[in-house]
Amino acid sequence: MKSSGGTSETTAILLSGGLDSAILLGHLLDQGVRVQPIYIATDCIWQAAEQQAIEQFLAVLGSDATLPLVELAVPLADLYGEHWSMTGSNVPDESTSDEAVLLWGRNPLLLVKAMLWCSMHGISRLALATLQGNPFSDASPRFFRQFAMSLATATCTDVNILRPFAEMSKAEILGLRSDLPLHLTVSCLAPRAGKHCGVCNKCAERAEALRLMPGGDPTIYANELGLVDQIF
């Protein structure tokens, strides 16, 4: 899937290993953009699965316009403590609302180090795969605008936060690049044996979206293999 043609000034992207940011990467490449993927390592329980997904996805994508992955550490164990994102206990299951997966201050934590890195390396654009309907206050236009202004004041440089999917649903973005190796992505709060658990909030969201794709959902879920213990 190598990209051809010229590329423009570099745009960084927060790449999580999930569906949304993978599609955003493909979308940027379609526009002839040279992309700098950035992964924020937070030590949440899904980190190893995300890192593996990103490595495999980028290898298969094989785009000359994608720069080597930058990984920045923002460990959260001291902040989140016994939260389910650290322990894996009482993970929000498929019956819960989007609000149940709140991670306190997630976007500020993900953005601050990535934006500083961009500023230090002369990159003026950072793209996020935030979708329409995100219920959290740190995904609002006001937050992104004010956060970017604060960083600009602190560093005397401008890093613009791009959110090209902000007015789109997951079903709509899936239609943009259904040819991507999306089976390699991971969208799970509690991976089991390298597979999606199949019973968490994010697995339910993933399954609902992918089953509408041609060929259906290719994901192998651990609960279908009897690999999920009773922690939910």
Each language-model region and where it sits:
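ATP-dependent adenylation/nucleotidyltransferase module used to activate substrates
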Residues: 1-180
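Short, intrinsically disordered, charge-biased short linear motifs at domain edges
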Residues: 174-177, 182-192
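A polyampholytic, Gly/Pro-enriched intrinsically disordered region
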Residues: 93-95, 180-186, 205-212
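Local cysteine-cluster metal-coordination motifs and their immediate loop/turn environment
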Residues: 108, 112, 186-208
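Charge-dense, low-complexity polyampholytic segments
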Residues: 126, 190-195, 215-223
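Serine/threonine-rich low-complexity intrinsically disordered regions
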Residues: 62-64, 75, 200, 217, ...
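Short Fe-S-cluster ligation motifs
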Residues: 204-210, 215-232
